[in-house]
Amino acid sequence: MMILWYNPFRRMIKVKLLKIKAFHYKNCEDGVELSFLPLFRKSEEDKTYELYEVAPDLYTFLTMSIVGKNASGKTSVLNLLNDVYRILGSFQLKDEVISINGTKLEITFYENEKIYLYKTELHKQFDLGNNLSFVNESIKVMNYSKTKKNVIFKEENYKPLNMKKELPDDISILFYILKNRNNYAYYFDDLVSEEGIYHKVYDLYNKGSINKKYWKYILQLFDEHIKDLKEIKNDVYVLTTVDQTQELSAKELFHVLSSGTTKGIALYTSAIQALKEGNTFIVDEIENHFHKTLVENLIVLFKDKSVNKKGATLVFSTHYCELLDIFNRNDNIWITKYDKKIILSNMYRDYNVRNDLLKSKKFYEDNFGTAVSYELLMNLKRTLMDE
């Protein structure tokens, strides 16, 4: 009798980002890089709660955090990640207020038993409006196997993928290999535009993976008085609470519900969408407007594989270092500093910190140079006292 060997990884065609590297990106130092791969030994507990097996013995993080002082570059790092996902998902990229004209990108990703190394330069062209052109593009490929897990980032192991570009200048050649894939990331900052937030959130609920049961629990998680919220036509809503039913415009609804409730509904709705699709969810300053327990529970949802069945990734920035104590590892924690340029370092790789110690304690001891300056606080206090 013939026995067919079943490879469970063959069905996983979702693109998984492994590393990004950038030059001339905004105010970041040249060669700034963000890796999604673990840097030290993986315990069985880590494989259960911290890591997702993309392919045999190839693991990526389920959660990652960017921490640092105010104005240290956390948002710029998240913007870089979001820009990369825009290229992977829509094969186009628009220039930004702080121009990224001249940026060079190196993107390493896994897709369908292969690892790709994509390089490009982004340039502004007059005839493309706000769209950037992709210049000097190249793609190299390596067939993945367990024996190659330690040479993923060594370019000499890749072979050039030759293709003739017959696309407009503002369309990446990644289109040829990823055109049938859903490679988007949800960036929470893109959702929160005051009253416009409700339409975007309800669109996720109505057209996405958020069924009636989830919707009810999400609403009541942030305001237990809400029984239901429906969009009956564009930007007109029916809000049902324990006391009454009201028909409200988006602007009126924005003032009836608290800011925390509005942002919380948006946060959890988009997080669940990412979980259901196995996509990446990016959140800047995750603790804003939310109770610490709600934020901790969101992080735990991404770490729990009974919920996170498709390997979705949560990447967030925070000032609240106690959140990092939820992490069992420290190689998924990245630290930003600003010294003429934005510098991104890894807690495990660049600092001598034992993994079994509380991360928050090390932050409060200012081991990473991220604490608020006591001297500056005292200068402000003395100035106020002298008035």
What residue spans do the PLM features occupy?
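Phosphate-coordinating catalytic segments in nucleotide- and nucleic-acid-processing enzymes
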Residues: 2-35, 87-276, 361-374, 380-387
